[in-house]
C-alpha cells in the first residue's frame, strides 16, 4: 500500500482541469472531483499535510477489507482525503435513498449501506456532520440514483444519516445491519 510522504503536494493542473497530488518519483494522482465543487484553496499549491496523512491512514484502515485491488484502495483513500479537504459544502440529496432508521451516527471512514428502489450501494463516510454525512461510493459498479442518474466509483454525495445502515463484514463480504 502506498505510504504518505512529506514530499507529496497538491496542485491544480489548468491543462487537465483537475486537482492533482504529486507523489514524487514522476507519479501524479488525478483527483476525481469536478473543478466546480472545489473550494478556492484547491487552486493554490500546498503540501500534503499531517492532517491529510492521518486521514489517508484512517481511510486505508477502514477500506482494507473491501473487495478492491490495492491500486483501487489507494485511489479511494486519496479521493476521500481530497474531498474531505477541498470539496465545497453541499446540501444533502437524501431523496434518492430510503430511510433505514433514526439515531444512527456513522463515524468517518465507516462503510455504510444506502438503498433505493433500484438497489443497494456501499459508501465510505468522508465527513460526518450533525445530521448528515458526505460519503463516497466504494462499489466499482455504477449505482443508480434514479432510472437516468448514476453514481460512479469514488463519487461523493451528502446524505442524511437516517438513510444509512451500518455494514458488517463477513468473510470479506459486507452486509447491512438494519434495526
Swiss-Prot record:
Where in or outside the cell it occurs: the entry states: Cytoplasm
Spell out the HAMAP family in the cross-references.
Answer: ZapC
Identify this protein by name.
Answer: Cell division protein ZapC
Main localisation? cytoplasm
Stated role: Contributes to the efficiency of the cell division process by stabilizing the polymeric form of the cell division protein FtsZ. Acts by promoting interactions between FtsZ protofilaments and suppressing the GTPase activity of FtsZ.
Any GO CC annotation of this UniProt entry:
cytoplasm
UniProt keyword list: Cell cycle, Cell division, Cytoplasm, Septation
Q: Which family does it belong to?
A: Belongs to the ZapC family.
Q: Does the keyword Cytoplasm apply?
A: yes
Question: Do you know which InterPro entries this protein is assigned to?
Answer: ZapC, ZapC_C, ZapC_N
Gene symbol here is zapC
**Which biological process, per GO, is one annotated for this protein?**
FtsZ-dependent cytokinesis
What Pfam families does this protein map onto?
A: ZapC_C, ZapC_N
Kindly indicate whether the keyword Cell division belongs to this entry.
Answer: yes
Q: How does it assemble?
A: Interacts directly with FtsZ.
Amino acid at each position: 500500500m502506498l505510504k504518505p510522504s512529506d514530499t507529496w503536494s497538491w496542485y491544480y493542473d489548468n491543462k487537465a482541469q483537475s486537482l492533482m497530488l504529486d507523489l514524487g518519483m514522476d507519479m501524479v494522482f488525478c483527483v476525481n472531483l469536478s473543478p466546480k465543487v472545489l473550494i478556492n484553496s484547491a487552486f493554490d499549491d500546498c503540501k500534503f499535510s499531517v492532517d491529510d496523512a492521518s486521514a489517508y491512514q484512517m481511510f486505508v484502515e477502514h477500506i482494507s477489507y473491501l473487495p478492491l485491488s490495492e491500486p483501487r484502495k489507494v485511489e479511494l483513500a486519496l479521493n476521500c482525503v481530497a474531498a474531505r479537504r477541498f470539496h465545497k459544502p453541499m446540501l444533502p440529496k437524501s431523496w434518492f435513498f430510503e430511510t433505514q432508521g433514526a439515531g444512527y451516527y456513522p463515524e468517518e471512514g465507516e462503510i455504510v449501506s444506502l438503498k433505493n428502489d433500484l438497489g443497494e450501494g456501499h459508501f465510505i463516510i468522508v465527513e460526518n456532520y450533525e445530521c448528515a454525512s458526505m460519503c463516497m461510493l466504494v462499489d466499482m459498479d455504477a449505482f443508480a440514483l434514479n432510472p437516468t442518474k448514476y453514481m460512479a466509483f469514488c463519487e461523493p454525495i451528502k446524505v442524511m444519516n437516517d438513510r444509512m445502515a451500518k455494514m458488517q463484514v463477513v468473510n470479506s463480504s459486507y452486509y447491512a445491519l438494519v434495526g
